[in-house]
Amino acid sequence: SNRLRQQDGLSYGARSFLTVGSFDENATFGAYAICAPENLDRVEVGFKEELNRVLRDGFTQQELDDARKGVLENAKLDRAKDGRLVRTLSNNIDLERTMMWDKNYEDALESLTVAQVNEVFRKYFPLENFSIVKAGDSSKL
């Protein structure tokens, strides 16, 4: 996001996300950028360069700390809001889990090291595993 939006000024907004479900063994890592049509190719190049940089250099401790903080704060919020707590409890019943599973998960997340995260990212997210989709008004290209 920082590279495409602030540094290169190519995108109105860019994000990446990881979705890991509990009901199946699949996960999704995705990224997107909103940009002017004339910037599409440069945004793709920037995305690939940034992904290759992470694969080569790895995530930093600060990036891991920020991501971990966000996940753990969201988990606390899930327990503080009635609707979210009900969803968590209901899912735990379906998954035959207790809230102790959630605590153990959060403890495991707390103990992750940058080296572990980088090893897993390199194993599962090489550039050749990505599908790149471009959408928009092609008449403006």
Question: Whereabouts are the PLM-identified features?
Answer:
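M16 family metallopeptidases and their MPP-like homologs
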Residues: 2-111, 128-136
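Short proline/glycine-enriched turn/loop segments at secondary-structure junctions
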Residues: 19, 121-124
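Mature hydrolase/peptidase catalytic cores and their serpin-fold inhibitory cores, especially
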Residues: 107, 116-122
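Short, intrinsically disordered, charge-balanced linker/junction segments flanking boundaries
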Residues: 139-141
